[in-house]
Amino acid sequence: MFASAQAPDFRDLLSMFVDEKYPKLLQKAEGYTLNEKTKKEALPYLFMSMGYYKMSSIDKYKEDYPDAFNNSLKYLSKYAKLDKTKESGAEYGDFFIDIRKSIISEAEIMNDQQKYTKSKALYKYLTDLDANDAGAFIMQGMTFVAIKSKKEAETAFKTAKELLSTDKCSVSDKDQKAFLKNALIEYANSLNSQSRKSEAVEWLNLGKKHFEDDKEFQVNYSSIVG
């Protein structure tokens, strides 16, 4: 009997990441993504995302790697498509928390600057990372409204509503839950300001069970519902 080939564990990439040898990590990981035997393995793409993400905040890399953050997102999306369950990247939970925060922060900046096409793309990275991120779909829907993409907005809001109404939305992570709360509050207040109170109340009711003890949510709920 022949032993079945096991998928590589890419411990060499982990070692380079831990040792902060990021350029070497990128070179090695890219080699795996171009190799016929390993190009469909998810971890090399994740390590490329992690490497670029670290480099994006280190001054000495800014000149040679000016697009490090964008490249981090690009490879994060590639990883997510290959690892639907995120099982292979489970031990790197801190990275996912950090990059999600960075994406949300960058999207907020883009929204403030009315660069909605860019913020829309950033929210897409969040939904690529977690297809049950109802908050990301709500915010994505709002950006579609801002750029007058009515059909796409309807699709995003419909997805968010389905996730909330079927209890499939991701709320186990506290930061993701807070993002959902903020998205619901922002969208509900936007609807209410447009004299669409019934829709605002509907959205708040969809998320209410997740925020029964959250003062901020309850204050906004009371101010809109009355």
Where is each model-derived feature located?
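Start-of-domain marker
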Residues: 6-70
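Alpha-solenoid helical repeat scaffolds
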Residues: 30, 70-73, 77, 124, ...
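Short coil turns that delineate tetratricopeptide repeat
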Residues: 37-39, 84, 131, 165, ...
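Extended amphipathic alpha-helical interaction segments
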Residues: 88-192
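Terminal, low-structured helical/coil segments at or just beyond the last alpha-helical repeat
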Residues: 178, 183-226
